[in-house]
Amino acid sequence: MRIGHGFDVHRFGGEGPLIIGGVRIAHPQGLLAHSDGDVALHAATDALLGAAALGDIGKLFPDTDPAYKGADSRALLREAYRSIRARGYRLGNLDITLIAQAPKMAPHIPQMRVFLAEDLQCPIDDVNVKATTTEKLGFTGRGEGIACAAVALLIKE
């Protein structure tokens, strides 16, 4: 078994869309990023890559490569997971923590879990998503952006 940790942060800016965990969420701004700015999937991808000792999302999908401009983070997650599967690993479980003052994530978490289970070809019970605030402290508390942490367990087959 191998454990990986991922973390990502993006600040709000532009008109959007705001995509978190593959779900489009109504919000006046999107997140500024080279790709679609999906902090949940970026943190999850980093956790998976870290567990497999394959570097990080920036190594696999460099933000200097125009091919990834505006990229769908679900596609990036699927591609990263294919590389992990090719090394003989499968997901044990994935746990994601979103950190944001707004928008409220709870209504969107069930669909995020569905997308993650689809993309990682696993039972929905192997993926968890939860959200918290920083009680209006720091950049997330001031509504300047969203942060996300993820932990993944991989099992050698």
UniProtKB/Swiss-Prot annotation:
The protein's annotated catalytic reaction(s) are: 4-CDP-2-C-methyl-D-erythritol 2-phosphate = 2-C-methyl-D-erythritol 2,4-cyclic diphosphate + CMP
Top enzyme class, one word, equals lyase
The pathway entry for this protein reads as: Isoprenoid biosynthesis; isopentenyl diphosphate biosynthesis via DXP pathway; isopentenyl diphosphate from 1-deoxy-D-xylulose 5-phosphate: step 4/6
Q: How is the cofactor bound?
A: Binds 1 divalent metal cation per subunit.
The EC code for this enzyme is 4.6.1.12
Alphabetic keyword roster: Isoprene biosynthesis, Lyase, Metal-binding
Residues the UniProt record annotates as site (Transition state stabilizer)? H34, T133
Q: Name one GO molecular function term.
A: metal ion binding
Q: What is the protein name for this chain? A: 2-C-methyl-D-erythritol 2,4-cyclodiphosphate synthase
Q: Which cofactor does it need?
A: a divalent metal cation
